Amino acid sequence: MTRYTKLFSALSAKNEGAFVPFIMLGAPTPEASLAIIRTVVAAGADALELGVPFSDPVADGPTIQRSHLRALDNGATVDSSLELIRQIRKEFPELPIGMLIYGNVAFTRGITQFYQEFADAGVDSILLPDVPVREGEPFIAAAKQAGIDPIFIAPAQASEATLEGVAQHSSGYIYAISRDGVTGTERQSSTRGLDKVVANVKRFGGAPILLGFGISTPEHVRDAIAAGASGAITGSALTSIIERHTTGTHPEPAQVTDLEALTEEIFAFVKDMKAATR
């Protein structure tokens, strides 16, 4: 069993959903991102979705775009991200770790090497948000060779062919989006029609469904699970908390103003979001 299959099996036995926070590696600083990750795990996060900073994050809204810049301004690289992942895996050997990384990173490092490096660091899954499933063949092959679960996005208004491809080729979980567009709480998630989104994806079978994009409140999490999803992913709402405790304007390196206050607020937020999965 993989870490994902163990997780979803254990949660199902408890009649719980999964809460998965998204965190940008190296943002606002490497040390702060590690402290944030330790905090979300202590608060009850079931798995992690980690970002590798990239200079042109087209699938992300303004909040997460700024987190890419904060990490880059503090010197984050793919290699430094891999080092952080190795540390996280050492501390949390059973925790599923998923990555959200732009496809250009894979091309730059070489697709086979890219997947093997992240597998060796302890990663369970990789989602390339700018690579649709119809273009996924070389990535799927390299991921499977390295023992990584390839994840694809199931868009809210996807064609049947796309949904069938996502269900067929995603393992670990399926990232279903509650609405089309970019990530972020700048456009709040509408929970109306979530059951139709989930049912549409489920028609083709496949891995458990996690809902994302605009999930920012416990009510959103409850609605996602009530709609039939196995859990929810939250990124921009958590990133906004981090941003409120950060100084510095791009391209100046950012700093955390009060790490204790930041981690306390994050702990409370994640605890409430996880409670909504029960």
From Swiss-Prot:
Its EC number is 4.2.1.20. It catalyses: (1S,2R)-1-C-(indol-3-yl)glycerol 3-phosphate + L-serine = D-glyceraldehyde 3-phosphate + L-tryptophan + H2O. Pathway: Amino-acid biosynthesis; L-tryptophan biosynthesis; L-tryptophan from chorismate: step 5/5. One of its GO terms (molecular function) is tryptophan synthase activity. Keywords: Amino-acid biosynthesis, Aromatic amino acid biosynthesis, Lyase, Tryptophan biosynthesis. InterPro entries: Aldolase_TIM, RibuloseP-bd_barrel, Trp_synthase_alpha_AS, Trp_synthase_suA. The active site is at E49, D60. One of its GO terms (cellular component) is cytosol. The keyword Membrane does not apply. Transmembrane segments: none annotated. The keyword Lyase applies. Coiled coil: none annotated. It is an enzyme of class 4 (lyase). Tetramer of two alpha and two beta chains. The alpha subunit is responsible for the aldol cleavage of indoleglycerol phosphate to indole and glyceraldehyde 3-phosphate. Belongs to the TrpA family. This is Tryptophan synthase alpha chain. The lineage of its organism: Bacteria, Bacillati, Actinomycetota, Actinomycetes, Mycobacteriales.
